[in-house]
């Protein structure tokens, strides 16, 4: 693929984003990734935004359908229809996740030439295995939970050694890893400890905040604090959803 073709694909991805056609955006950035050339920061973010929206729509649908399916007053037929529809959405969600994980393992992680990119992609790997864990059961769930935790931990270890505590990618990783502990592993203490440590470490080094990423970093710090408030409150309702990181 020529440089011109690649630039056209990136331009198409931007047009798709502006028109909120995220499936088109994801396919354009998938093609860019499959050239095998390391992505620029802009391209990396376009890929992440595209798939986050594509998978996010299915995650949201899955939650709604699951709650309808669990309503005891629904007739057996209604519950059956809801189950069949949920399974269809699950199939779509799994296909998207494995598509992303394939790109990460084949192209993105091996080509990552700096710690920032490596952490970004390992975090992404943790995220997409976490999305699989949300809908999996039994042994299949155990496998994807382990894969998610391994990817997050690898990213976490690199980020602690190579990145400032105020770096938005390191903060976003801590945010999502803590959500993994809270929601997937049912470990609120570990989730709070991780989120609090990340927040405190960033506060202690606020003077290292990069002007370019100031907004991103402070936003994620706010999300960490919001989750800590949510997780430590006794009056937490069942409907409350923890905040997840963006695409830094």
From Swiss-Prot:
Keywords (alphabetical) are: Cytoplasm, Developmental protein, Differentiation, Endosome, Neurogenesis
Entry keyword annotation includes Metal-binding: no
- GO (cellular component) term, any one: cytosol
GO molecular function terms listed in the Swiss-Prot or TrEMBL record: molecular sequestering activity; protein heterodimerization activity; protein homodimerization activity; transcription coactivator binding
Give its localization: Cytoplasm; Early endosome
Record carries keyword Glycosyltransferase: no
Q: Which Pfam families match?
A: 14-3-3
Tissue specificity statement from the Swiss-Prot or TrEMBL entry: Predominantly expressed in the ventral nerve cord of the embryo, and in the neural tissues of the head. Also found in the region posterior to the morphogenetic furrow of the eye imaginal disk where cells differentiate as photoreceptors.
Its chief place of residence is cytoplasm
User: Which GO biological process annotations does it have?
Assistant: chromosome segregation; germarium-derived oocyte fate determination; learning or memory; mitotic cell cycle, embryonic; oocyte microtubule cytoskeleton polarization; positive regulation of hippo signaling; positive regulation of Ras protein signal transduction; positive regulation of torso signaling pathway
- Quaternary structure (record): Homodimer; homodimerization is not essential for modulating the activity of Slo. Interacts with phosphorylated Slob; the interaction with Slob mediates an indirect interaction with Slo. Interacts with phosphorylated yki. Interacts with hemo; this represses 14-3-3zeta activity which prevents the 14-3-3zeta-mediated activation of phosphoinositide 3-kinase Pi3K68D.
Its biological purpose is as follows:
Required in Raf-dependent cell proliferation and photoreceptor differentiation during eye development. Acts upstream of Raf and downstream of Ras, and is essential for viability. Acts as a negative regulator of the slo calcium channel via its interaction with slo-binding protein slob. Inhibits yki activity by restricting its nuclear localization. Binds to and promotes the activity of phosphoinositide 3-kinase Pi3K68D which converts phosphatidylinositol to phosphatidylinositol-3-phosphate and promotes maturation of early endosomes.
Family statement: Belongs to the 14-3-3 family.
Mind telling me what this protein is named?
14-3-3 protein zeta
Organism annotation: Drosophila melanogaster (Fruit fly)
Q: Which gene encodes it?
A: 14-3-3zeta
């Amino acid at each position: 693929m020529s440089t011109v073709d690649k630039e056209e694909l990136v331009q198409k991805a931007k047009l798709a984003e502006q028109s909120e056609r995220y499936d088109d955006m994801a396919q354009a950035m998938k093609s860019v990734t499959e050239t095998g050339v390391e992505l620029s920061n802009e391209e990396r973010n376009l890929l992440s935004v595209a798939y986050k929206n594509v998978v996010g729509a299915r995650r949201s649908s899955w939650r709604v359908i699951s709650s309808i399916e669990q309503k005891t007053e629904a007739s057996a037929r209604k519950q059956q229809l809801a189950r069949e529809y949920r399974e269809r959405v699950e199939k779509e969600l799994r296909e998207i996740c494995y598509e992303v994980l394939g790109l990460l393992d084949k192209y993105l992680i091996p080509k990552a030439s700096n710690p920032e990119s490596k952490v970004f992609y390992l975090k992404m790997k943790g995220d997409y295995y976490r999305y699989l864990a949300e809908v999996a059961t039994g042994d299949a769930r155990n496998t994807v939970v382990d894969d998610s935790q391994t990817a997050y931990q690898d990213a976490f270890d690199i980020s602690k050694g190579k990145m400032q505590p105020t770096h938005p990618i390191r903060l976003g990783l801590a945010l999502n890893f803590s959500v993994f502990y809270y929601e997937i592993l049912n470990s609120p203490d570990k989730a709070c400890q991780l989120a609090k440590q990340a927040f405190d470490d960033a506060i202690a080094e606020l003077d290292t905040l990069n002007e370019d990423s100031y907004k991103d970093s402070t936003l994620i710090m706010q999300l960490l604090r919001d989750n800590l408030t949510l997780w430590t409150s006794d009056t937490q309702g069942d409907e409350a959803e923890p905040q997840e990181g963006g695409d830094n």
